[in-house]
Amino acid sequence: MNGTRNWCTLVDVHPEGQTAGSVDVLRLTLQSELTGDELERIAQKAGRKTYAMVSSHSTSHSLASELVESNDGHEEIIKVYLKGRSGDKMIHEKNINQLKSEVQYIQEARNCLQKLREDISSKLDRDPGDSVHKQEIQVVLEKQNGLSEGPLTTYSSPPEVDTHINEDVESLRKTVQDLLVKLQEAEQQHQSDCSAFKVTLSQYQREAKQSQVALQRAEDRAEQKEAEVGELQRRLQGMETEYQAILAKVREGETALEELRSKNVDCQAEQEKAANLEKEVAGLREKIHHLDDMLKSQQRKVRQMIEQLQNSKAVIQSKDTTIQELKEKIAYLEAENLEMHDRMEHLIEKQISHGNFSTQNRAKTENLGSIRISKPPSPKPMPLIRVVET
């Protein structure tokens, strides 16, 4: 699974003299754990065909297979090239990691069993007792490895072996109890952390919702102010047009007044007309002054509205920044929560594997007193399956 070719041998062993009440043994071993003699014996008992599944890195979408003869000519190797999809890469990596962890747990259990066997063997070697007990323990160890093939008789274990085994069981039981206590403490800590994370997450979500509502309101107010500014600008344009028209009329009246004054200064009618024109000019000037004041006031209002609009935009930008920070905090908390879940699952799987090991060990120690070994059934050729990954 590490990018090179790894071999995994699956063998169905049918010993000789198989009866109706016997049990078939199915063994899964790694290629690196088998010696040359064992591989040759397994190959002779298994069939003459070997299926190899090869993961190819080619970009084609076809499924190719290849039939290859082995070097010794006693078996056939059928290679099947599997093309993985890019979308299944994450699932494939997850399965690989899970298989690696399972293999690691199996290796730890096997190492513990091997250590226990070595301890028992060393104790029996130091004991100057009868050799029958050694033969009994050797039979037990061979039975655990699945290598017992001949007829064996039942022996009773010595009291010293039972005492040592009981001590080992008690130590394993204490270790399991300590690990269970640690697991419960870790679960309680995880639950408290989860509740704290949930409270913090809900608080951040509420703050994000409130910020979004405030942002929406600010955007609505900004749109309303923009509409008001547009209306004021249209009014200013109309007032400027009216101002230009009135200014043109004033100039025309002044021109006519000067003409009348130049034509007939002594004419009363012209004087009255001139007076009327002067009054009109004065009224128009007052109107112009009033319009000028209104124009200045509207310009001040427009400047104030523009300043308010800029302030609203600054507030909106600050709200956007706050919302982005809250989203980043939420993503960070979710990532921490997922990491905590993965750690708890890993710890629970490890504790479960240790619990299964202690149960199997206790069952084996209880059966050390009386051992009954059935006759090995006759071998039956089965196919040898090898999984190759490139």
Swiss-Prot record:
Modification sites for Phosphoserine: 171
Tissue expression per record: Present in the extracellular enamel and is mainly associated with the crystal component.
Transmembrane feature ranges: none
Listed InterPro entries: Tuftelin_GRINL1A/MYZAP/CCD68
Gene Ontology molecular function: identical protein binding; structural constituent of skin epidermis
Alphabetic keyword roster: Biomineralization, Coiled coil, Phosphoprotein, Secreted
Coiled coil region boundaries: 88-126, 162-351
Record's GO cellular component terms: extracellular region; I band; RNA polymerase II, core complex
Any GO BP annotation: biomineral tissue development
Disulfide bonds, paired cysteine numbers: none
Subcellular location: Secreted
Free-text function comment from the UniProt entry: Involved in the structural organization of the epidermis. Involved in the mineralization and structural organization of enamel.
Subunit structure: Interacts with TFIP11.
Family recorded in the similarity comment: Belongs to the tuftelin family.
Protein name: Tuftelin
